[in-house]
Every structure is written in C-alpha cells, then in structure tokens.
Swiss-Prot record:
The lineage of its organism: Eukaryota, Metazoa, Chordata, Craniata, Vertebrata. Antibacterial activity against Gram-positive bacterium S.aureus and Gram-negative bacterium E.coli. Weak activity against C.albicans. Keywords: Amphibian defense peptide, Antibiotic, Antimicrobial, Disulfide bond, Fungicide, Secreted. This is Ranatuerin-2La. It comes from Rana luteiventris. It holds the Pfam family Antimicrobial_2. GO terms for cellular component: extracellular region. InterPro entries: Antimicrobial_frog_2 (IPR012521). Expressed by the skin glands. Disulfide bonds join 27-32.
Length: 32
C-alpha cells in the first residue's frame, strides 16, 4: 500500500543520508 511504499522511500533516503554522513566522518578521521 501507500504506507509501504513510503516506508521504502524513507529507508532509501535514510540510507543515502547515512552514507553521506559516514563519508564525511571518514574524511575527518583519515583525511580525503
């Protein structure tokens, strides 16, 4: 249903944001 597809989109966005945050953290720790 609509809720399920919304959950799927939210998960995708959350994954994307988490990935970007992790990349920034890695840059701070190890340098880019």
């Amino acid at each position: 249903g609509i809720l399920d597809s919304f959950k799927g989109v939210a998960k995708g966005v959350a994954k994307d944001l988490a990935g970007k945050l992790l990349d920034k953290l890695k840059c701070k720790i190890t340098g880019c």
